[in-house]
């Protein structure tokens, strides 16, 4: 079952914000929807698992956008990233953390994650 979790982003005067998509979830990160609202174009987003720090997405979208994050698997022989393949990103019993920079002075937007919790 795909779960939808959202949070409103409200920046401080310096354009920064940190929000958490709650509650904790376990599953595959299927998609991320960024709705810019009044946030500045080129707002920096860094999205990770709160506990593990697993990288989910880093981007500076110019406007509202959908993302389908994937990771590069590592080669068994030397640990180097395999550039020709991708694998799903999972979170386990944690919230998703969204760190925002350069979003503009006290502006708002929305971040939504779609988690496929039937992967277990």
List where the protein language model places each region:
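Surface-exposed, low-hydrophobicity beta-strand/loop segments enriched in small/polar/acidic residues
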Residues: 1-120
